[in-house]
Amino acid sequence: MTMDDLDLRLLDGFQRDLPLEPRPFAAMATRLGTGEAEVIARLVRLRDEGIVSRIGATCRPNTAGASTLAALRVPAPRVDEIAALVGAEPGVNHSYLREGDWNLWFVATAPDTAALAESLVRIEAATGLAVLSLPLVRAFNIDLGFPLIGPRRAMALDRPADLDALRPRDKALMQALSSGLALVPRPFVALGQALHRSEAEVISRIRALAEARILTRVGVIVKHRALGWTQNAMVVWRLPEAAVEAAGTALAGVPGVTLCYQRRCVPGLWDWPLFCMIHARSHAEAMEVLAEARALPELQEVPHRILFSTRCFRQRGATIAEVAA
């Protein structure tokens, strides 16, 4: 994989804030000092080379659909078998093998909570293993991005979504954005045709959903491992409910912490409510970020566990609507 300066500036500058106008790639080209056709050609190449996943959006969990982070305790000889069974469930969009007793972690998504519960029941039936389900309680930072130029950066703190902005037809639009825009000069025309909506309406709704923080990011969604971010550590922290908000707010501001949120505990099975993700280019870099986090006054002496990913089985956009139309 070889990327030049323009590739790096394209990927670094547009992982969020895609220009929401009829010719977004032309607007990107103007900022980059090149042409629209060149931007589109590069995005096609970067997608085909496995560096870019899509040009689209990431959606806030549990707004237009339902989701949970879940885990299984899988005996080592059955890892490949169980991972295949979990991956066969349509709503599973992320699946990783991690260090620890609960070792196969996955994100399950569905159009609603009832469908999500049914999905987890099917996984339990197929695998013969109990599912640990840890739904999101609150997000401190879910604006995942990967700086390619300059030092590590602190991610912006999350703000609550305005769910009143959601409209009945937005689910299909969000599902389409999770799959990605067509790499053509006027992608919102193509998207609108698929959804039987006008270009202007599509752009207006994307802008409204982004401003409402229902869409947490609109831009170039990269495949971080292909860009050298090979270390993926999930760090969990055990602390009382009353301390979670202050600790989570501080933790989310540490450069190198790429996601931070609180999840529901399960008595007797899981008592680690605060989660953060550290994506790094090396194990040593990840541990440096963790050291900075542990030095925070809110987290000093707080018990924690660091669970590195050892294999990635699946990573794709979320399932929001049963039919994107």
From Swiss-Prot:
The keyword Protein biosynthesis does not apply. InterPro entries: AsnC_trans_reg2, HTH-Siroheme_Decarb, NirdL-like_HTH, WH-like_DNA-bd_sf, WH_DNA-bd_sf. It catalyses: siroheme + 2 H(+) = 12,18-didecarboxysiroheme + 2 CO2. Keywords: Lyase. Its EC number is 4.1.1.111. It holds the Pfam family NirdL-like_HTH. One of its GO terms (molecular function) is lyase activity. Pathway: Porphyrin-containing compound metabolism. Belongs to the Ahb/Nir family. Forms a complex composed of NirDL, NirG and NirH. All proteins are required for the total conversion of siroheme to didecarboxysiroheme. Involved in heme d1 biosynthesis. Catalyzes the decarboxylation of siroheme into didecarboxysiroheme. PANTHER family: SIROHEME DECARBOXYLASE NIRL SUBUNIT (PTHR43413:SF1), TRANSCRIPTIONAL REGULATOR, ASNC FAMILY (PTHR43413). This is Siroheme decarboxylase NirDL subunit. It comes from Paracoccus denitrificans (strain Pd 1222). The lineage of its organism: Bacteria, Pseudomonadati, Pseudomonadota, Alphaproteobacteria, Rhodobacterales. The gene is nirDL.
